[in-house]
Amino acid sequence: MPRGVIALGIDPGTRKLGWGVVARAGNRLTHVAHGVIALDGSESIASRLVELEGQLTQVIRHHRPNVSSVESLFFNKDAQAAAKLGHARGVVLLCLAREGIPIAEYAPAKIKRTIAGTGQADKRQVALMVRAALSLTSLPPVDASDALAIAMTHLRLGGLLQALEEAKGVGATATAENRAQVLLALLAKKRPRRITVRRRVG
């Protein structure tokens, strides 16, 4: 991952959307900004999505991130809530793609494990680790803290795949098939040696 990369992490929602911007230079992560886009719950879902698109676009254009990361959609027993969250994620992906920003997605457990060391961490544990890692003076709002954690996850994990791709001449615009071919080639070169165990006789 190049020096001075700026990552925008987003925790989608139809009432509150958290966002966090983190910069990386070498191995050092630096807090840039964070916030929460609060939407009027009394408005229709369509109206909220329009408002979300406008405010998120302003955030993206102001901070001009190099990369972005979004929490992936997880299965929810409440089908209606899951559908609304899917609408919000669609708007988020649209805004990022329209600005030409590469998008990575991470499962909630992956984010928790990367930041707090366990996939079972609660939101406060994640927030405390975010505050410590970024040297913040206070705990950010929960949604913003989650977004910062998402950005940090990509800065810590996303660089490896990109470095492998660049080493093989595969850029950020490569297709999923090309990326898969690169990984398969690398794995083929790193197959473990076969060890033969001989039994002692007598």
Language-model segments: residues:
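Phosphate- and other anionic-substrate recognition elements at nucleic-acid/protein interfaces
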Residues: 1-202
